[in-house]
A protein has these predicted regions:
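A short, conserved alpha-helix in the catalytic core of glycosyltransferases
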Residues: 164-166, 172-222, 360-362
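Short, well-formed alpha-helical segments that are part of the catalytic scaffolds
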Residues: 12-27, 332-333
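A conserved acidic beta->alpha catalytic loop
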Residues: 22, 38-47, 63
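Active-site-adjacent helix/loop segment of glycosyltransferases
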Residues: 207-282
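Conserved donor NDP-sugar-binding/catalytic core segment of glycosyltransferases
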Residues: 91-127
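Glycine-rich, basic loop-to-helix element that forms the pyrophosphate-binding segment
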Residues: 60-78, 99
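Short, flexible, basic/aromatic active-site loop/helix in glycosyltransferases
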Residues: 132-171
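Short aromatic/hydrophobic "clamp" motif used to bind/position activated sugar donors
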Residues: 83
């Protein structure tokens, strides 16, 4: 066994289905196993996935055990030279895993590697590579200095934006959304710390890998990450869990060295959480006022007919371009029509490879980027970040 893929799922069965469809292509020719740990979903995820993906090993928990604990359950049972911890709200292109394996095979000093995560508008997610949140780095993030001077090697350590995103780089923290790990390294440093319910466990694991003498890397390979579709990222609960993880990390690794900073860190983290909650609430109000639904579908005619039927009751105008990546290699970017009338482009995944779709989206330019939707004839579902049809 070369690779075991571990996915923790909670009430996202259609996003998980899309992820698994992409994995079927990405795992061709690789001796691999897929482990799905369901954290007591209420949307019938285990039965739905088992009927469509008999090759997957499914573990069903009777409660939401959190991300770290659920991953550990599968890691203990999984076999393979490598482990991939993967979020269910992702799309993995066809050659990504083979290239990760090739890199890790050639770098025995590598403990983990991450990739370039794209948002649904094709923009680069800064969480793809991060520095360790030392007290100073965390201060720069919380105070806004990191945002003011993003490319500064002093103030911008949190997101490492001074590094070239198109080149392989050594980094500190590999994101838990796509964390490609050497199994022997995990056996050496231990499993995910279950004190972290969700968020922060990837930082802690990356830190322990570095302390054990391994190196962590960023590879310029694209995946799509809807960024937490299974969580309400603007909710008070999300912000509490996210910022509490920062406190857990500080208390575990830095409090003994900087005891006087503890009350300052707690106050700063609490204040930042409140600011973010207010900011996210305002964003939600703005999104509710957005009614534009003009979409562009690119793919096969018979597939378009199926997709249009899904949208018939959703007040969505769906224009059609019959094409494939062979005759329209740059997708909507090759079209002469004005694209600013659309806010979403839907690609037929039978007519375009996942790799090609993400390549096209990554080359989007301008402020008004189109958001991505995908339609798979195999699932009969049209998937966007906001909704599944």
């Amino acid at each position: 066994m070369k690779l075991s893929v571990v996915i923790v799922s909670y009430n996202v069965k259609y996003y998980l289905e899309q992820c698994l469809l992409s994995l079927r292509r990405a795992l061709r020719g690789i001796p691999a196993a897929i482990w799905i740990v369901d954290n007591n979903s209420h949307d019938n995820t285990p039965a739905y996935i088992a009927a469509r993906f008999p090759e997957a090993n499914i573990i069903v928990n009777n409660a939401n055990l959190g991300f770290a604990r659920a991953n550990n359950i599968a890691i203990k049972q999984a076999r393979g030279e490598y482990l991939l911890l993967l979020n269910p709200d992702t799309i993995v292109p066809e050659d990504t895993l083979a290239r990760c394996i090739r890199f890790m095979d050639n770098r025995p000093d590598a403990g983990a590697c991450g990739v370039a995560m794209l948002k649904d508008d094709g923009s680069f997610a800064y969480e793809s590579r991060r520095g360790l949140p030392t007290p100073f780095t965390a201060f720069c993030k919380i105070s806004g200095l990191c945002a003011l001077f993003p490319r500064s090697r002093l103030f911008g350590r949190y997101y490492l934006r001074y590094l070239n995103k198109n080149k392989i780089n050594r980094i500190d923290v590999v994101s838990g959304a796509f964390c490609f790990l050497r199994r022997s390294a995990i056996d050496k440093v231990g499993l995910l710390d279950e004190d972290f319910f969700m968020y922060g466990e990837d930082i802690d694991l990356s830190f322990r890998l570095l302390n054990a003498g391994y190196k962590n890397f960023y590879l310029p390979l694209r995946i799509l990450h809807y960024k937490g579709e299974s969580t309400q990222k603007s909710s008070a609960r999300y912000l509490h869990v996210f910022y509490n993880a920062m406190l857990i990390f500080f208390n575990k690794h830095y409090r003994a060295r900087f005891p006087l900073l503890a009350p300052i860190v707690r106050t700063a983290v609490t204040a930042r959480a409140l600011l973010d909650f207010c900011s996210q609430k305002n964003k939600r109000l703005k999104l509710k006022n957005k009614h534009k639904k003009n979409w562009l579908f690119i793919g096969q005619r018979e597939t378009f007919i199926l997709a249009r039927q899904l949208l018939s009751d959703n007040a969505t105008d769906l224009d059609f371009v019959e094409a494939s990546e062979k005759n329209l290699p740059h997708g909507h970017l090759d079209l002469s029509r004005k694209l600013n009338r659309y806010d979403c482009v839907v690609y037929d995944t039978d007519a375009f490879s996942y790799k090609r779709i993400l390549l096209i989206m990554a080359h989007e330019h301008g402020v008004n980027r189109l958001r991505l939707g995908t339609f798979s004839p195999l699932s009969g579902r049209l998937v966007t970040m906001d909704r599944v049809y």
